[in-house]
Structures are given as structure tokens and as C-alpha cells.
């Protein structure tokens, strides 16, 4: 299956966010800028977290925001936002979060597989820290193993 490309428009490094909602909105804006999703997809990701809690915080310092495939998803897309100051999502063990990934998947059949594939990129224990410290889009892509 493979992960979607990560264009420059889908990357925002050392951004500022007042809280987790603002961080997810930034990630959604990156997906929108890159043409992968409509602006409303950020609202869907936030709604999922409101409904199900901070399940998106999958590792210390890392959130993988996503929502179900729907009309807001234009094509498969990936976004990366690193935060200058980490924010809390309310996770009992993995807060605060400094790296927010956003994933938009067009096909319901590929949704869970793509979430799992992206999560597996962080089996390397220092990957979150390296991504948080990335200063260029190319560094972020290299850490994730994705193309532009």
C-alpha cells in the first residue's frame, strides 16, 4: 500500500499552538494546503478525539490525528506539524505532544492499514525526538521514509 507523499505544503515545523485543538487544526490546514482534504477534515479529526478521547496520542510526544474516510478526503494525504512548545491532549502516559501527524485516507479498505503502517514508522524509539528536532522538510521526509 505505502504511505502517501509528504509535499512541502503538508509540513509545518516548530509551529505554535495554544492547545491540542489548535495543533490538530494546524495539521488539518496542512492536509488542506496540500490538496488531500477539505478544510472541514480538521473538524472531523477534532470530533473523533472529542468522542473517543486522546486515543490519537500513540507514543510519548506523538499524536496521529485522523478521521474516517468521507467526503472531506480528496485523496490520500499525510501532514506533519512539529510544535515549538508541546501541548497536552489529556493522555495519561504520552503527554505532552510535540509532533502531530495527520492522515487522510480516501478508501475505507485502506484506512486501518495505513494508520498501522504510519504508526510502525515510530518503532524506532528516537524517531519522535528526531522528527521534533527536524529543521527542514527533507529531514522530516527522511525520518518518515516518504517521498515529496
Positions of predicted regions on the chain:
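Cytosolic covalent-transfer regions centered on His/Cys nucleophiles
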Residues: 1-148
Amino acid at each position: 500500500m505505502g504511505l502517501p507523499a509528504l509535499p512541502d505544503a503538508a509540513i509545518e515545523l516548530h509551529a505554535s499552538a495554544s492547545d491540542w485543538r489548535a495543533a490538530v487544526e494546524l495539521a488539518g490546514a496542512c492536509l488542506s494546503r496540500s490538496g488531500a482534504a477539505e478544510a472541514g477534515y480538521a473538524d472531523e479529526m477534532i470530533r473523533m478525539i472529542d468522542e473517543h478521547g486522546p486515543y490519537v496520542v500513540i507514543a510519548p510526544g506523538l499524536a496521529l490525528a485522523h478521521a474516517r474516510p468521507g467526503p472531506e478526503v480528496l485523496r490520500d494525504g499525510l501532514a506533519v506539524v512539529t510544535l515549538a512548545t508541546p501541548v497536552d491532549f489529556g493522555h495519561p502516559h504520552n503527554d505532552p505532544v510535540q509532533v502531530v501527524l495527520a492522515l487522510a485516507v480516501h478508501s475505507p479498505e485502506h484506512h486501518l492499514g495505513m494508520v498501522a503502517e504510519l504508526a510502525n514508522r515510530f518503532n524506532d524509539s528516537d524517531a519522535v525526538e528526531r522528527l521534533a528536532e527536524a529543521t527542514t522538510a527533507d529531514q522530516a521526509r527522511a525520518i518518515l521514509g516518504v517521498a515529496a
